[in-house]
């Protein structure tokens, strides 16, 4: 506390000296002709002085002040910036699966307070106006000392929802890097890229996204590296791009091997790289960390801390209307003794304990108070697992339950990051998140069976 007070006093002294110089200039004889103006200006400057001291005190308490270059050793090795919570977890879990301490924070302003080696930040910018999303990214760049991180990763939605391309343009412009590499493919989940076109194959069917054209529309004109190249070929193409003054490159990827080649090729250059992609690129990056990265991160493959399922119920917060999620819900209703909460007719506490509890979340309608009402009477020991689907829903639910950060562990299955609530009434309980389009049809049933075994109804019993 004494150190804090001394720091504030020191800042105030410096600010006072700056204002004093301005006041002396105003008192110069050439300004004496307008004493009223001088008096007013001096009063204004005194007001500014108070504001400077207050802002610095507030920034220090909230962890918003920039960190000097000499403090870089205290920062995390990797920072991930995503536009929603599930996206942040999708990318960050790639590192926790390798045994690296990884934390996802809901409030990016508090990110620098984390001691984790990998920190993921949710800017909550997917569903807001473009200019506001741009402003939030500019704030991240300004308030966090991004140069202190070994790698910067901008997570983009694998089907490019929200303000994806405006955020990419802002990131390339604002975030410190020598080279920006974009590789949005996620082959493990049926998302590939050829000739600047991303093809998505899932339960909905097959769709294509002309990424190249949309990048051009956002004012970006990247160099292109086709799929099927070796890491040496990728490195060579990147070097040529840099030599010719092009610091933004788009890489196709049709397979996992293509993504690995992109990462290995990028690391051969030994320059600061801004990575832009989906969780597929994050996994490739985590699996191909060089010795240089190893100096900053503690990789412990196979030593991921796990929390064993505890007694209690599984609560499914369903905030996605994606067809994949709807199919998963149909399967859950058929195979478990599921209890569905209605905000119009709340369930009794005793009823809730019969089976997994499903709480519908409608973005723009469901409030934090509604979430708290659905969980009324349930304590930490009553809950084994919290499952949340839908990015905006995840943020809403976590805030309602007092969860400000998640310590990630691994994936329940690809695309379903699994972690532990760090704080709030449900601290220590497992939290599983899922983007709407991810997961096999029976994944919710398997979550219920894992974390609430007695809830599972045999298929023959359902007839």
State where each predicted segment sits.
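Short hydrophobic targeting helices and cationic amphipathic motifs
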Residues: 35-38
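Cap/lid and interdomain-hinge subdomains that line or gate substrate/regulatory clefts
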Residues: 74-78, 101-105, 109, 117, ...
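Short, flexible loop segments at boundaries between secondary-structure elements
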Residues: 278-287, 294, 299-302, 309, ...
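Conserved, well-ordered active-site substructure
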Residues: 383, 392-443
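Redox- and metal-dependent alpha/beta enzyme cores, enriched for Fe-S-associated oxidoreductases
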Residues: 304-374
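Short hydrophobic alpha-helical segments enriched in small aliphatic residues
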Residues: 12-15, 23, 32, 48
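Short acidic, glycine/serine/threonine-rich loops at helix termini
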Residues: 91-93, 163-167, 191-198, 260-265, ...
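Short beta-strand segments
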Residues: 81, 120-122, 154-155, 181-185, ...
């Amino acid at each position: 506390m004494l150190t804090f007070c001394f720091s504030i006093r020191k800042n105030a002294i410096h600010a006072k000296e700056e204002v004093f110089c301005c006041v002396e200039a105003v008192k110069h004889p050439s300004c004496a002709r307008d004493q009223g103006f001088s008096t007013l200006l001096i009063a204004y400057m005194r007001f500014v002085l108070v504001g400077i001291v207050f802002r610095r005190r507030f920034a220090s308490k909230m962890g918003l002040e920039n960190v000097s270059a000499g403090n870089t050793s205290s920062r995390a090795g990797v920072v991930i910036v995503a536009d929603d919570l599930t996206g942040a977890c999708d990318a960050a879990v790639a590192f926790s699966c390798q045994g690296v301490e990884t934390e996802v924070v809901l409030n990016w302003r508090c990110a620098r307070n984390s001691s984790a080696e990998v920190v993921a930040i949710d800017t909550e910018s997917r569903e807001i106006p473009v200019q506001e999303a741009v402003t939030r990214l500019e704030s991240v760049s300004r308030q966090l000392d991004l140069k202190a991180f070994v790698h910067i990763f901008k997570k983009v939605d694998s089907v490019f929802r929200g303000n994806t391309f405006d955020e990419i343009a802002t990131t390339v412009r604002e975030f410190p890097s020598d080279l920006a590499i974009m590789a949005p493919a996620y082959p493990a989940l049926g998302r590939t890229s050829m000739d600047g076109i991303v093809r998505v194959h899932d339960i909905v069917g097959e769709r294509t996204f002309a990424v190249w054209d949309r990048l051009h529309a956002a004012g970006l004109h990247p160099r292109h590296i086709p799929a099927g190249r070796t890491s040496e070929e990728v490195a060579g193409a990147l070097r040529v791009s840099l030599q010719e003054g092009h610091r933004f490159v788009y890489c196709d990827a049709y397979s996992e091997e293509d993504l690995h080649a992109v990462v290995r090729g990028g690391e051969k250059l030994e320059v600061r790289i801004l990575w832009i992609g989906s969780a597929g690129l994050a996994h490739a990056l985590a699996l191909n960390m060089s010795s240089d990265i190893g100096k900053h991160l503690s990789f412990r493959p196979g030593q991921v801390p796990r929390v064993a399922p505890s007694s209690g119920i599984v609560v499914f917060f369903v905030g996605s209307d994606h067809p994949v999620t709807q199919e998963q819900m149909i399967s859950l209703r058929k195979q478990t003794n599921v209890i569905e909460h209605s905000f119009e007719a709340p369930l009794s506490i005793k009823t809730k304990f019969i089976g997994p509890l499903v709480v519908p979340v409608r973005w723009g309608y469901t409030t934090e108070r509604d979430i708290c009402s659905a969980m009324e009477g349930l304590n930490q020991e009553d809950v084994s697992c919290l499952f949340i689907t839908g990015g905006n829903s995840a943020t809403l639910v976590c805030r309602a339950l007092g969860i400000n950060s998640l310590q990630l562990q691994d994936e329940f299955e690809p695309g379903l990051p699994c972690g532990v609530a760090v704080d709030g009434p449900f601290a220590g309980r497992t939290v599983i998140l899922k983007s709407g389009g991810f997961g096999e049809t029976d994944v919710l049933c398997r979550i219920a069976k894992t974390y609430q075994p007695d809830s599972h109804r045999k298929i023959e019993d359902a007839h």
